[in-house]
């Protein structure tokens, strides 16, 4: 069965062929997806028999490797496959067979995306934030202080000028915004005075309008021409290593070239010496009706979000909301170290359910809870209890809390004593 899949098998690991692309700086980038089988914490050989018969206590692991020419290799977290699909049917799969099917599906999807990348008209995915409500100490160890900016709850957008002089405005996922003529008109005027190679990175926004309304306007072919473009960064495809503080200086110079813009704005920068100053600014911004704050490492390069990469040179500060929800079930994580670790399932008044990660339990405690907590014990001690949940925001589409973490039960309950 191994010979039915494209790729090479070596050292007990099967790797699909590399999918190669070229970065905007001209370097070759490679993405590889691999499958291995683990039994009792040991990688074991993959045999053809595993495609028809499961091996006791064995799980399959899928992972990817990504590297740019002359750069370090980044290895993803393991996705574990613990059971096949369609069990009991003619088309049933074993653990290993299912893992290979899943990996092949991801391989084909990535290959299609990369084929399309050659016709993406110069789109570079914007830099994404890694840290949430944490500012690394290294931000304050640079010669230049980090800067803080207002965080607007809008729609991410990047602007660039194409070879024919037309303005391209696209999303975080490299989807072109077809409307927004009021913004594109001003961008075209601005590009008459600046380096046409520069990309402007920002957010589509209208103050105090809900995100759902903003997204609807941004994605409409014909919009109401009310949205504004707030630019918080800029970059050049061949100068991605340029530090953040230098990019901000150039961005200020860009906006000095044309100061009569109505719908395009440079985001205001605030230099901070320590975490307390950043937190005070965050509190100020929230009072003003904004979502929070963004902190930028002064010496950080511009790191595009290829393959959903999140840059360690950005931090997002937002208030955590909290509310109480009814606990109705429990489950486990699906990938990596979360597999086998307990998760709570809560229910909204409209009966929609969502998963909550216990905040104050160690992984060891979560593993033990999932292993020892029976449905009978859960029903007797936990079902229907009110669970205090902190979260970043509610999904505008479903109303489900996002980034939800369980703080504790309303009534004092030590869940570890139950087991």
Curated annotation (Swiss-Prot):
Known role: Very low-fidelity DNA ligase that seals nicks in double-stranded DNA during DNA repair. Together with the viral repair DNA polymerase X, fills the single nucleotide gaps generated by the AP endonuclease. It is not essential for viral replication and recombination. Displays a very low adenylation activity towards DNA with 3'-dideoxy- or 3'-amino-terminated nicks compared to regular nick DNA.
Residues holding a divalent metal cation 2: 291
Keyword Cell division belongs to the record: yes
Family recorded in the similarity comment: Belongs to the ATP-dependent DNA ligase family.
Residue numbers spanned by region OB domain: 318-419
Residues annotated to bind ATP: 149, 151, 203, 232, 294, 316
Gene: LIG
Domain of life where this protein originates: Viruses
GO molecular function, one term: metal ion binding
InterPro entries tied to this protein: DNA_ligase_ATP-dep_cent (IPR012310), DNA_ligase_ATP-dep_CS (IPR016059), NA-bd_OB-fold (IPR012340), NAD_dep_DNA_ligaseB (IPR050326)
Organism field: African swine fever virus (strain Badajoz 1971 Vero-adapted)
Keywords per UniProt: ATP-binding, Cell cycle, Cell division, DNA damage, DNA recombination, DNA repair, DNA replication, Ligase, Metal-binding, Nucleotide-binding, Virion
Entry's Gene Ontology BP terms: cell division; DNA recombination; DNA repair; DNA replication
Name listed for the protein in its UniProt record: DNA ligase
Renumbered residue ranges of the record's region NTD: 1-120
EC numbers for this chain: 6.5.1.1
Keyword Oxidoreductase: no
Chain sites annotated for binding a divalent metal cation 1: 203
Compartment annotation: Virion
Active-site positions on this chain: 151 (n6-amp-lysine intermediate)
Chain positions covered by the region annotation AD domain: 121-317
GO cellular component, one term: virion component
Miscellaneous remark of the record: Consistent with its intracellular location, ASFV encodes its own replicative DNA polymerase and three base excision repair enzymes: a class II AP endonuclease, the repair polymerase Pol X, and an ATP-dependent DNA ligase.
Enzyme class: ligase
